[in-house]
Amino acid sequence: MAASAKKKNKKGKTISLTDFLAEDGGTGGGSTYVPKPVSWADETDDLEGDVSTTWHSNDDDVYRAPPIDRSILPTAPRAAREPNIDRSRLPKSPPYTAFLGNLPYDVTEDSIKDFFRGLNISAVRLPREPSNPDRLKGFGYAEFEDLDSLLSALSLNEESLGNRRIRVDVADQAQDKDRDDRSFGRDRNRDSDKTDTDWRARPTTDSFDDYPPRRGDDSFGDKYRDRYDSDRYRDGYRDGYRDGPRRDMDRYGGRDRYDDRGSRDYDRGYDSRIGSGRRAFGSGYRRDDDYRGGGDRYEDRYDRRDDRSWSSRDDYSRDDYRRDDRGPPQRPRLNLKPRSAPKEDDASASTSQSSRAASIFGGAKPVDTAAREREVEERLQKEQEKLQRQLDEPKLDRRPRERHPSWRSEETQERERSRTGSESSQTGASATSGRNTRRRESEKSLENETLNKEEDCHSPTSKPPKPDQPLKVMPAPPPKENAWVKRSSNPPARSQSSDTEQPSPTSGGGKVAAVQPPEEGPSRKDGNKVDVVGATQGQAGSCSRGPGDGGSRDHWKDLDRKDGKKDQDSRSAPEPKKPEENPASKFSSASKYAALSVDGEDEDEGDDCTE
């Protein structure tokens, strides 16, 4: 039995669900509906709510929405649509006038007649600016002979003329002025602003015409706009959810709002889609200015950024009216008066002010650097000369005052007189030799005086000899009286005459006294030293000395000779010619009287000694 059961199991048959349900329902011969295959494109069209591009057949009416009239779609060509015009606004009698807005500024009457070719046009009016007759206001009027021509002209709304999309509307005689001031005032002002830059350029809003419209945004925007609009709050919900075409004849000049937005896709579709929030909540403050008279909402928002877009409707219209009366702002004309001769003072003042204004340095003058450098150099040179004179004056002042050389001869004569008085008792020969020695000494002193005077005359600017010369000691026998006591009693005389002291032999023996010469004046010459040494040698023969005097005398001679050579070497460059060889004339005249006085004094002393 089990084997038979296995044999009875067979593979089942696949049937559709509708057939299975029909068999289970017991209806027997029920009709079965098999859906036709639908492409994914058709399904998305149904979900989006858009209409397919194919016409529906009667078989599809069960599954699809009823067909929609293509002529009301905004994407349909304008030639396929009838002009959506309120016939109640059309004039019943001529003239049949159409308003033309957004005209190019280079438009002419012939170009407008060519634009409306085929129509019975009778006249064209193009208003011009009162301040500038060559400039158009941007709008005009066209009169037609019959009503059919006017209807045909209204169907040409938003057509291009000279790279501009012009507006064609019915011109009501009672509303011409108000329409000019309020409805198209913004367009004229906007176009006049564009003339300042590139008014021939294509409007920037044309690029938004290619965007497809969206369904649902229109009712949403109308609902909130009407809700916040205080003037039309009563009709808010009714107008916001109205499905059919909406006409506000009294307020918007008979223009169909849906037609206006439908013909301009950017206003209804693109702009409301991207800015619905601003449109819903901000339109209450804008007082419905965006849609008045077919105004371009997008251009009004972005082309005209001024405070009037937020003002009330009445204020805005009055402002436009005043601005139209005034005309565009222009530069005031120059009122040139006849030229009059300006005053000299005013002219000089103006020239001075203009010169100061033109000079970036003001009243400053350029500095003559060469002259300034010369002045500085002269001032520095004067200062150096003054400083040099100040340095030279102290040197001249420091020069010791030269005393007349007669004081040396007198002092020497007194000393010799005392010495000869003491020596005359010894021998007459010694007195004679002393007298000759004194005569030679006086002659040499006069000669030294003459030489000193001539040297001063020939070399007034010669440097004085250095004061720090080595001290010299002169060998001399002890005098009659103590030389140290005499020096202490009369230091100036001794200091000045120490270099002319002569050795005098005394009975005390041969002692040598070291005599320190004082500071020598500038007139002191080396010839005096040699003469003194010669005089000492002359007296050495007649004076009795000790056994050691000869050696010490030779030693001091050598020292004096070396010192004289050093002084000669330390002298400055060879001075001008010095008449050392021929002072005979001056010496004879000066020494003649000196010799007589010395001889007379010697004779008197000799007489005293003999007595």
Curated annotation (Swiss-Prot):
Cross-link (Glycyl lysine isopeptide (Lys-Gly) (interchain with G-Cter in SUMO2)) at residue(s): 343
Bias-annotated ranges (Basic residues): 1-13
Acidic residues composition-biased segments: 599-611
Gene Ontology CC terms: cytosol; dendrite; neuronal cell body; postsynapse
Biased amino acid composition, Basic and acidic residues: 79-89, 173-203, 211-271, 285-328, 370-420, 439-458, 551-583
Modified residues (Phosphothreonine): 412, 500, 506
Amino acid composition bias (Low complexity), ranges on this chain: 348-359, 584-597
Protein's UniProt name: Eukaryotic translation initiation factor 4B
Organism the protein comes from: Mus musculus
Annotated gene: Eif4b
